[in-house]
Amino acid sequence: MLGYNEKLVLLKLNEVKKARIEELVKLTGLEQVAIMRALLTLEKEGLAKISERKERIIRLTDLGRKYIQMGLPEIRALNVLKSKKKVKLDELRGVLTEDELKPIVGILRKEGWVKVEKTPEGLVLEITERGENPEERPIDKALKILSEKEYATSEEISKIVPINELKRRKVAQEEEVVERIAEITEKGVELVKKGIELKREVTSLTPELIASGKWREVEFKPFNIKAPVKKIYPGKKQPYRVFLDKIRRKLIEMGFIEITVDSLIETQFWNFDALFQPQNHPAREWTDTYQLKYPEKGYLPNRELVERVKEAHERGLAGSRGWGYVWSPERAMFLMPRAHATALSARQLAKGIEIPGKYFTIQRVFRPDVLDRTHLIEFNQIDGFVAAEDLTFRHLLGILKKFAIEIAGAKKVKFFPDYYPFTEPSVQLSAYHPELGWVEFGGAGVFREEMTKALGIDVPVIAWGIGIDRLAMFRLGIDDIRYLFSYDLKWLREAKLIW
């Protein structure tokens, strides 16, 4: 069904058969946007067709429009000469700018409008007979045409004056435009012959229409509710931050207490030694961790705790023989960007916990690695532990499986035996990603008694450290971990928020 605008455009097209969009604007009085919308509907119905052609056009510049109002510099200079007959060049400064004054003698002489005389006081210009009665020049004709419409074709103007002359004088510019031409089809002509009633349409039912009863007489414009509309991108939270907030809420709802900390820097004591990781372990070397150049060292905690950790390393605790080496407090003082969030679990255990108790933290950690779609050198890790009497390894597997399925949305989960200096037994958690295959989430285990006893804990503690960025990959349906920290507007706009 055709609306008012479509009918109006079709009737006008029937009168002229073919017209440019600009011509239809004048014929119908409609805006160009409304005409294009109407033509697209008519074309879809086979009543009109739209063709395009590229064309070079000439349009006035800002300087050109200024000269239309004031006159070209040579015309203004000539007007002064007509009244005074003879003037010094300096006398023209009142009507011309410095930029206009520089070429003015050459232009006036070329046109034959003046004679130039050199005097001790400077150049003197005297008007000629030709200057008294100047003919209209090609450039004047071209500017007059351009002043009467928005633009003219290059072909039209080039017949009057060389385009380069207009460009050189910076009064006009040449552009390439796409010209759209509408033409009525035979089907459109036949429809007009049958008769078209041009009746204004109403787009909304107002209280006035109802009260007056005129709603019975007017024609309401039909709306296509399936028509595509322009997408709107309102303010939106960063998808990954929303995911992290959801994890926090879920864990707190499950009774976990969050461990918060401001610093990204740890001493090796908390990152390694308190976790019963020997000082000669390869994971402490530059290939696996970063070190601070300045300041190089930090402070150790209270002496009693340091002595217990030293004893665990050198001679062992809880029936263990330890690592059997001389532990160095100097080595433990070196500062480093945190390599894993388990360092905060050790801090919390030493600080004191509720028993039974459940704790977690989400922290930024740093490790040397090769950047790819599943690895970053700076990433987030969720670390947690549960301390209670009678806890077993099977309790840990149950928590990990719940993490992978309920939080990450993984369909398949696997556990692999693993090794960590501070847990025994230890396990690796992996989940299946439809694009990447099996992806490692992180490690877990039961904290060794050499660690927990040194930190003052006498009950079993099950713990895990999981790359939460990889959990987010599953939940947000992406196959490149770098998207989580990306400025890609397309992804940020289209990514679903996980509440």
Swiss-Prot record:
L-phenylalanine binds at residues 342, 381-383, 422, 447. Keywords: Aminoacyl-tRNA synthetase, ATP-binding, Cytoplasm, Ligase, Magnesium, Metal-binding, Nucleotide-binding, Protein biosynthesis. It comes from Pyrococcus furiosus (strain ATCC 43587 / DSM 3638 / JCM 8422 / Vc1). GO terms for molecular function: ATP binding; magnesium ion binding; phenylalanine-tRNA ligase activity; tRNA binding. PANTHER family: PHENYLALANINE--TRNA LIGASE ALPHA SUBUNIT, PHENYLALANYL-TRNA SYNTHETASE. It is found in: Cytoplasm. It catalyses: tRNA(Phe) + L-phenylalanine + ATP = L-phenylalanyl-tRNA(Phe) + AMP + diphosphate + H(+). Its cofactor is Mg(2+). Belongs to the class-II aminoacyl-tRNA synthetase family. Phe-tRNA synthetase alpha subunit type 2 subfamily. Its EC number is 6.1.1.20. Pfam families: tRNA-synt_2d (PF01409). Binds 2 magnesium ions per tetramer. It is an enzyme of class 6 (ligase). Tetramer of two alpha and two beta subunits. GO terms for cellular component: cytoplasm. Mg(2+) binds at residue 424. This is Phenylalanine--tRNA ligase alpha subunit.
